[in-house]
Amino acid sequence: MGIFSIANQHIRFAVKLACAIVLALFIGFHFQLETPRWAVLTAAIVAAGPAFAAGGEPYSGAIRYRGMLRIIGTFIGCIAALIIIISMIRAPLLMILVCCVWAGFCTWISSLVRIENSYAWGLSGYTALIIVITIQTEPLLTPQFALERCSEIVIGIGCAILADLLFSPRSIKQEVDRELDSLLVAQYQLMQLCIKHGDSEEVDNAWGDLVRRTAALEGMRSNLNMESSRWVRANRRLKALNTLSLTLITQSCETYLIQNTRPELITDTFRELFETPVETVQDVHRQLKRMRRVIVWTGERETPVTLYSWVGAATRYLLLKRGVISNTKISATEEEILQGEPVVKVESAERHHAMVNFWRTTLSCILGTLFWLWTGWTSGNGAMVMIAVVTSLAMRLPNPRMVCIDFIYGTLAALPLGLLYFLVIIPNTQQSMLLLCLSLAVLGFFIGIEVQKRRLGSMGALASTINIIVLDNPMTFHFSQFLDSALGQIVGCMLAFIVILLVRDKSKDRTGRVLLNQFVSAAVSAMTTNVVRRKENRLPALYQQLFLLMNKFPGDLPKFRLALTMIIAHQRLRDAPIPVNEDLSVFHRQLRRTADHVISAGSDDKRRRYFGQLLDELDIYQEKLRIWEAPPQVTEPVKRLTGMLHKYQNALTDS
């Protein structure tokens, strides 16, 4: 396919984007809005953003959800701007500096919350800055300007959502159904690999792929939940299926590890059962029925605990999967599964990374302010706005430098493209609403094609072009103003890029160490006799951290194996029959405190000291278990955990 070719699957979204832009433009001028540009720009960004992220037409609900986040972020930003202006109207410089700090604060928050919701916080940061900069000459018009901006943005979002509904958005439900079947087959094949106890690299690749697919399925669940309220029952089942899929991975990998020391635990009967190849979910269903009969015949005590747990989890997976596909009423058996343990939310391990993002955004905005005041350039405020926009949106993504480069390419492409519209197209079409709408529709259509291909600069070009062409009411054509706006965008992106290059993010290794220590803390916290704590489901949170570790350190198998071993230890200790008495309960609390100290330690020396203390306490704990005559189901996992911590002590304590 050529670089400028148009694929059939890209046409529908390109028409949808063009329709959203035309609707916003028509409504903006029809109702005599002062700056219809904001409505058009909002419609374009809300519609094109999810398509750029997805690399194609977004699924149903994605545009609607992004629109809601933009409304929330805009309102938060407007309220913050009003508070800042009312409090500091007599000190304009201080007011702008506080806005720079506010933009940094919002970026810090957006780095810590879920990636789906971070857009609202990033938007609220630069919205406040835009309002404060715009009303510098007429501060008394702040409430009116904030209200107009909110109204125009809501209109733009409404147009994007309406265009999405008009062109029958894709439903993700069929993809979810197919992935559920495929995932169960892959889970069975992973257990086959683990029972064969073959090449460790092949097993690592298999479980790593399943972790990614399970995380992707959770993302599909979020999309399905946004799509329609009729998928509420499917959403509940998919939440439980996420935990079951992670449980299957854990039990398979534990089966592999057990065979390193005790291969005789896996009997020939089960080895023969798992030798049968499977291709479809029906094959898996037949095999599970055979296994359940074998387990009933041999007895639970004669069945390895990992296989027994795996078969039970796979059976529950099959039951819930059928419910998701049919979307029928939840049965009593399903309700019992769904009313399982409460899921514990993950605590962010990227606090240092978030602080780096705070300083990057704050410093770049302050640098833009100084540049504006020093040069007195009429479009210095435009440069400041672009700095805030780029840093607020770039910081929450894995590769901020590439986002900046995308914006730089986009603003450079917007200069000749905007020039064509400013000098030729708009002056010749402004007297006809039809021609004006058609000219903007052509722009939206062709950039919509490139956005779906994730062409570098396409998203930035769309936003930057709409921002600099004259879409105000009334239209005024001042070439110097156009040139200033276009150059201001380019300079702003350049300054943001320079700050990102200068303020280095060296938090990667620290984040990796914090993640590994959080796995250790989770394994230690599983040693408890507290009934409520034992019922907590930490598995989704632990695998979410493992997924982050895999993204931060691609290909680092030792880190992944260590993390997975800690997850297995957590699950095994959580189900272990620990003797219930006050002596052990007190010591459990002491172990948890020490593990928390390891995570929160501010220096390597403190961390090593607390880690050494944790190892000593684990040795004492093993002695206590011997005194209280704990069964092997307790003593063996604790011994394995202690051995792992001794082996990887340096990796867990050194920065």
From Swiss-Prot:
InterPro entries tied to this protein: PHBA_efflux_AaeB/fusaric-R, PHBA_efflux_pump_AaeB
Role: Forms an efflux pump with AaeA. Could function as a metabolic relief valve, allowing to eliminate certain compounds when they accumulate to high levels in the cell.
Sequence ranges on the Cytoplasmic membrane side: 34-37, 90-92, 142-151, 391-406, 452-458, 503-655
Side of membrane Periplasmic, spans: 1-12, 59-68, 114-120, 173-369, 428-430, 480-481
GO biological process, one term: carboxylic acid transport
UniProt feature coiled coil, ranges: none
Pfam annotation, one family: FUSC
Provenance organism: Salmonella typhimurium (strain LT2 / SGSC1412 / ATCC 700720)
TM spans (from-to): 13-33, 38-58, 69-89, 93-113, 121-141, 152-172, 370-390, 407-427, 431-451, 459-479, 482-502
Protein name in UniProt: p-hydroxybenzoic acid efflux pump subunit AaeB
NCBIfam families referenced in this protein's UniProt entry, alphabetically: PRK10631.1
Membrane topology listed for this record: Multi-pass membrane protein
Keywords recorded for this protein, A-Z: Cell inner membrane, Cell membrane, Membrane, Transmembrane, Transmembrane helix, Transport
Family per similarity comment: Belongs to the aromatic acid exporter ArAE (TC 2.A.85) family.
Subcellular location(s) per record: Cell inner membrane
Entry GO terms, CC: plasma membrane
Molecular functions (GO terms): transmembrane transporter activity
